[in-house]
């Protein structure tokens, strides 16, 4: 390993006792050591050269240790562990510059590391991030996802996930499609979310087994697509009468086979609705609780 040693000799002519200062610079470490007192070197947060995404994937596929890989300049992590096991500790990775997390752990069925400390503040795409990650259940509620514009299918099929994420700032997101589809264990509060930018909500809670949380505070004023949003839900039965559905176009099968739902939503504004076939077929909804246009 290459080293450069700079020795400075303080001369007595300057009224300073003789002392030696050593600066040691290696490929992976930098340390300033006063009087060369034998202090140990302090590592940076990674070891080696900065990697590109392609180089990181090659390292992962090689089976070598990537726990301290230098990924600080990678902005796109989409799919890097898709369908793969994560065999080394990545909890210390610096993700501060990553914008795209799409499918990062999709179908990584054994992944369950605590990545709650990751810096997600640059993230804009969280789509499919944990899709099919059937073991993942870590406390990521403190993530800063405030720049996220899509959460499509983020937890689809993540059957173990059941962590509070109600403090997330999702106010910039336009797409929530399939976000919790078949996330059968998920049952956490979401009523505080600001979804006012959301346009796409299709299949968001489809086939959720346990989810039954209030959503009546949601600002749905920009929602256009809500097909299958609560289809085949088994527990959901919460009031939604406060929703502003004036821009809603596609309501097809929204409550299809929603076997528990029977709330009065007859006041919904359906003036923009163009698709609403099978709106409540197979559900527990009483026709009197259905918007007149959809009966």
Predicted regions and their residues:
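Negatively charged
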Residues: 18-295
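Sec-dependent N-terminal signal peptides
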Residues: 7-9
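Positively charged n-region of N-terminal signal peptides that target proteins for export
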Residues: 1-4
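N-terminal signal peptide c-region/cleavage motif recognized by signal peptidases
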Residues: 14-16
């Amino acid at each position: 390993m290459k080293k450069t040693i700079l020795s400075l000799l303080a001369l007595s002519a300057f009224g300073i006792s003789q002392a030696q200062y050593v600066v040691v610079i290696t490929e992976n470490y930098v340390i300033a050591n006063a009087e060369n007192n034998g202090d140990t070197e302090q590592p940076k947060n990674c070891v080696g050269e900065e990697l590109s995404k392609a180089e990181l994937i090659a390292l992962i596929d090689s089976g070598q240790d990537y726990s301290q890989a230098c990924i600080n300049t990678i902005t796109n992590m989409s799919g890097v562990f898709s369908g793969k096991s994560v065999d080394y500790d990545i909890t210390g990775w610096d993700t501060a510059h990553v914008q795209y997390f799409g499918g990062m752990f999709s179908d990584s069925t054994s992944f369950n590391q605590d990545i709650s400390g990751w810096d997600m503040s640059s993230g804009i795409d969280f789509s499919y991030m944990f899709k099919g990650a059937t073991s993942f259940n870590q406390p990521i509620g403190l993530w800063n996802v405030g720049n996220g514009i899509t959460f499509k299918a983020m937890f689809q099929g993540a059957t173990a996930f059941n962590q509070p994420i109600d403090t997330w700032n999702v106010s910039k997101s336009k797409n929530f499609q399939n976000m919790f589809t078949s996330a059968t264990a998920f049952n956490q509060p979401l009523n505080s979310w600001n979804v006012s930018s959301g346009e796409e909500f299709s299949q968001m809670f489809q086939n959720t087994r346990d989810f039954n949380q209030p959503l009546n505070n949601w600002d749905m004023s920009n929602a256009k697509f809500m097909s299958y949003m609560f289809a085949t839900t088994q527990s959901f039965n919460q009031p939604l009468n406060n929703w502003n559905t004036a821009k809603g176009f596609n309501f097809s099968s929204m409550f299809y086979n929603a076997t528990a739902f029977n709330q009065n939503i007859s006041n919904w504004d359906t003036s923009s609705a163009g698709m609403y076939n099978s709106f409540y077929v197979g559900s527990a909804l009483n026709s009197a609780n259905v918007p007149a246009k959809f009966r």
